[in-house]
C-alpha cells in the first residue's frame, strides 16, 4: 500500500497547496486532470491510513510523504467530493460538446434522408421492383443495396447519380449509437446531482470556502442551462428518429437504417464508376470499329 502511495505521489508535479487552490477555484488551467484523479485515489479513510502505517515497514520516508499529503488533504472539508467536482468541471465542456455534435448530426442526417427527393425516387423504384417480384414490400430497406447490381436501373438513375450529395451527414450519423447518447445524458444528470449535493453540503464549510461555493454555484447554473438545451435536442432527435423509423418494420433501429443507407451510397457510387468505365470501354470499341470501317473503305 505504501509503494502504491509513492507511485501516485510521484505523478503529482506541482505543490499540493497550489493544486488545492486550483481545485477550490475550479481553475482547470493550473492542474492536469490526471493529477487530480491520482489525488482522489489517495483520499483514504482513517482506517485505510492506519493500514498504510502498518504496511509501510521501515520505509519511513514514503510513509512521511503520504502522511504529510494526507494531512493537508484532510484540512479541506470533504476533500474527495471537491476533487470529484473539479474533475467533472474539467471534463464537462467536452462531454457537452460531444452530445451536441452527436445530436445535431443525427438531426441533420434524418432531415436530409427524409427530405431527399432523389433518395425518395430510388426507394420508390426499389419498392416497385419488389411488388413486381412478389416480395415483401416491408423489406425495402434490406434490398436497397441490391439495386446497384441492376445495370439497367443504374442507367435509368442517371439523373439521380449525385443523390449522395443530399446526405452529407449520413456517414457520421451511422457511427453514432442512440444508446450512447442516452447513457451520456444520464451521466450528466448524475453529475449535476453530485455537484448539487456538494454545493448544499459546503454551506457549513465556513467563511474560507465562500469563494468555492460561488464557483460551484456558477458551475451548477452552467449545467442547468446546458441541460435545458440538451433536453430540447434530445426530444427533437427522438421525434425525428421515431418518425423516420416508423416507416420500417418493427425492430429496425436507426443505426441499422443509416448503416444500410451508407452502404447503399458507397455501393451506388462504385456501381456508377463501373458503369462509367464500361461506357468508356464501349465507346473506345465503337471508335475502333468506325476507324477500321473507314480504313477498309479507303482500300
UniProtKB/Swiss-Prot annotation:
A Gene Ontology molecular function term for this protein is: actin binding
Q: Which Pfam families match?
A: FH2
Stretches assigned to the FH2 domain = 1-295
Q: Which domain of life is it from?
A: Eukaryota
Q: Cross-referenced InterPro entries, in alphabetical order?
A: FH2_Formin, FH2_Formin_sf, Formin_homology_domain
Q: Which family does it belong to?
A: Belongs to the formin-like family. Class-II subfamily.
**Which PANTHER family does this chain map to?**
FORMIN-J (PTHR45733), FORMIN-LIKE PROTEIN 14 (PTHR45733:SF17)
What name has this protein been given in UniProt?
Formin-like protein 12
Give the organism the record lists: Arabidopsis thaliana
Identify the coding gene: FH12
Amino acid at each position: 500500500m505504501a509503494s502504491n502511495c509513492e507511485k501516485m505521489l510521484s505523478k503529482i508535479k506541482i505543490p499540493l497547496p497550489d493544486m488545492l487552490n486550483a481545485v477550490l477555484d475550479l481553475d482547470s488551467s493550473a492542474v492536469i486532470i490526471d493529477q487530480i484523479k491520482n489525488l482522489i485515489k489517495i483520499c483514504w479513510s482513517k482506517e485505510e491510513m492506519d493500514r498504510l502505517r502498518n504496511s509501510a515497514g521501515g520505509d519511513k520516508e514514503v510513509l512521511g510523504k503520504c502522511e504529510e499529503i494526507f494531512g493537508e488533504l484532510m484540512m479541506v472539508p470533504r476533500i474527495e467530493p471537491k476533487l470529484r467536482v473539479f474533475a467533472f468541471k474539467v471534463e464537462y465542456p467536452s462531454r457537452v460538446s460531444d452530445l451536441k455534435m452527436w445530436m445535431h448530426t443525427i438531426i441533420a442526417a434524418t432531415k436530409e434522408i427524409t427530405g431527399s427527393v432523389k433518395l425518395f425516387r430510388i426507394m420508390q423504384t426499389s419498392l416497385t421492383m419488389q411488388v413486381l417480384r412478389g416480395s415483401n414490400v416491408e423489406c425495402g430497406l434490406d434490398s436497397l443495396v441490391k439495386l446497384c447490381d441492376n445495370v439497367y436501373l443504374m442507367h435509368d438513375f442517371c439523373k439521380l447519380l449525385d443523390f449522395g450529395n443530399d446526405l452529407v451527414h449520413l456517414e457520421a450519423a451511422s457511427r453514432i449509437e442512440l444508446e450512447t447518447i442516452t447513457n451520456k445524458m444520464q451521466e450528466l444528470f448524475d453529475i449535476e446531482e453530485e455537484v448539487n449535493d456538494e454545493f448544499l453540503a459546503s454551506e457549513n464549510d465556513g467563511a474560507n470556502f465562500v469563494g468555492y461555493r460561488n464557483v460551484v454555484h456558477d458551475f451548477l447554473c452552467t449545467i442547468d442551462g446546458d441541460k435545458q438545451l440538451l433536453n430540447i435536442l434530445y426530444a427533437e432527435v427522438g421525434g425525428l428518429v421515431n418518425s423516420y423509423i416508423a416507416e420500417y418494420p418493427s425492430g429496425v433501429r436507426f443505426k441499422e437504417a443509416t448503416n444500410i443507407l451508407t452502404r447503399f451510397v458507397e455501393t451506388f457510387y462504385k456501381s456508377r464508376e463501373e458503369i462509367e468505365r464500361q461506357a468508356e470501354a464501349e465507346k473506345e470499341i465503337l471508335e475502333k470499329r468506325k476507324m477500321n470501317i473507314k480504313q477498309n473503305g479507303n482500300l
